[in-house]
Amino acid sequence: MTVSVGIDKIGFYTPSLYLDMAELATARGEDPNKYLIGIGQSKQAVIPPTQDIVTMAANAASQILTPALKAEVAMVLFGTESGIDNSKASAVYLAHLLGLSPKTRAIEVKQACYGATAGLQLAADYVRVHPQAKVLVIGADVARYGLRTAGEVTQGGGAVAMLVTADPQILTLDMVSSYHTEDVMDFWRPTYRTEALVDGKYSTNVYLDFFKTVWADYQQQTNRTIVDFDAFVFHLPFTKMGRKGLRQILPEAQPDQQKSLKAAFEASQEDNRNVGNLYTGSLYLSLLSLLRHGQLTAGARLGFFSYGSGAEGEFFSGILQPNYQRGFDGAALTTLLAQRKRVSVAEYEDIYRAQLSNDSRDVQLPVGEEVAQYYLAGRQNQQRQYREQ
Ligand code: COA
């Protein structure tokens, strides 16, 4: 008998600062509605130098890992394109910071915004073979395009942590999925750069083309059509992107279903609209947003489109489980977002420039205002100094 496998728990973390997108638009000489409606972003997470992918992942994972679960994690798959080391995996730093058992495999997975999906699917296959195993999958990134660039409005950052197990509380993953890879230069970041190179308009078109391709292939493999779905969840580098994706397939649905799919999309973009781009975590923040704000019932089939520039796309699906609300702490996320402090454009620019320098100097970061459990205190002897409070 095939074991049902999927997402048992989800945790999310984003730092305690944000920038208002209407204010950024005004500072950049743009109509605020371009950012609020045209791009579809209201707030953007501002990442202080005291947070990086490891600390954000630890802050997300600590929400879902009890001491007993920490002893049971068999593998950590850390999806990111914001790596802090060309050799050592961020998953190893994370496993140590969380106090996981040394009997754990810990590796990093990279393919732009697709990394966490690769982690999720590899984790699911592993658990199908080892049904007792629990795998921690992370999607954590800092989305940086640069001050005064076209991509600036699509920045952000944060981490999603998912526990993949047999008989999961939130979502069982269907076995069939459709994936597609092509060598495309729409977005990339050579090792000498701290900001990505991107052709945003081209990337938007590749995203939509890949979605068309994998959606058609998925339907052919499964004989399912749009009527078999209650909601679609998209990778959201900015919320308008997913809206364009949904528009591409809506004509396949009858008017009533179009209405419910649109309502589900509105729920799925709400939290992303207030956090910004998490790169590889974005699809899973959108899932969390749908679970928090949507009107879904157990048994609903959800479709997921994952896209990582460069480029790789995947369409997969899963079934919502009866106790899905027990798999995440919605109230904690509401509090996390509500308690963030708004920074001005000038403050954001200072924080943006204050990121840990790309050299070997010893640095002590100003940790006085840091409220997160895990944070970065600086660098000594070329080693990042992680702390817990
Ligand atoms: N009110 C409402 N909408 C407005 C507006 C206004 N006053 N002014 C402009 N808009 C709309 C435009 O019509 C456009 O909508 P559309 O895409 O539906 O046609 C949208 O706002 C964006 O305007 P545009 O002129 O295309 O913006 P831009 O040249 O500044 O670029 C991106 C936008 C998204 C391409 C750019 O931010 C970017 O490159 N981001 C990075 C993308 C990325 O991360 N890609 C890789 C991962 S998939």
Language-model-derived ranges and their functions:
Residues 1-50, 149-205, 209, 316-389:
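Condensing-enzyme catalytic core mediating Claisen C-C bond formation in acyl metabolism
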Residues 288-337:
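Catalytic phosphate/nucleotide-handling subdomain of diverse soluble enzymes
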Residues 201-222, 227-246, 250, 271-276:
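A conserved active-site cap/scaffold subdomain adjacent to cofactor or substrate pockets
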Residues 31, 53-68, 90, 206-222, ...:
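Short, well-ordered amphipathic alpha-helical segments that serve as non-catalytic structural scaffolds
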Residues 128-161:
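Flexible, glycine-rich active-site loops centered on histidine and acidic residues
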Residues 7, 53-113, 223-249:
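Conserved beta-ketoacyl condensing-enzyme motif
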Residues 34-38, 42-54, 82-134, 251-282:
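Conserved catalytic cysteine-centered active-site region
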Residues 11-13, 79-84, 111-116, 139-144, ...:
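Acidic, glycine-rich active-site loops and adjacent beta-strand->loop/helix elements
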